[in-house]
Amino acid sequence: VNEVKHILIDLDGTLTDPKVGITTSARYGLNKVGYPIADHENIDWIIGPPLKASLAKIMNVDVTHDLAEQALLGYRERFAVTGLFENELYPDVIETLKTLKNQGYQLYLATAKPHVYAVRILEHFELLQYFTHPYGSELTGERTNKGDLIAYILEKEQLNPAECLMVGDREHDILGARRHGIETVAVEYGYGSEQELNLAAPKYKIKSFKQLLDLLT
């Protein structure tokens, strides 16, 4: 991975484990629109991909359906206040980001999460200082697609894809980066199953975030 100068990093399932906040807020939003989810039902698969589409899938309606929008608004009502911080850092994240920055890499957050939430989470965990710029989606839905988000970052920052690396935990991180000719690293501790990651076929897989340092040396 010699030419790498810029590292695009996913948030949920890569830097932080947002399971409690996201799933509890999703249950809240779905319940508000009359779709209660049983406690024993696992909805961890919603962590990472564009949320509105996942909520629509649970309710078995089209993503353009008003119910999907209403469930998303209900989700945000709880997430923006409480869910945001029902979240924890994965091991060695701070030390690894600090080392990468000190080694001269430019780090960019690349999350499908709305930018306004992503920045608050980075500030909460004191991670913002390590990023050249944090990129996320808009509350209106633009750039929730990982490929679109990556295209936007490349254009805004005038980056050469050959000098970039994408680090994430789900197939859309890998596929979105590949669409733009960017090498990929999948973290195995996030929310992408082994099967999902095998099918996405990232160039590298790591078992802990700090293994990124070994890849880059």
Region locations from a protein language model:
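Active-site neighborhood of HAD-like aspartate-dependent phosphohydrolases
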Residues: 1-45
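A short, structured active-site edge motif that brings together acidic residues
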Residues: 46, 128-143
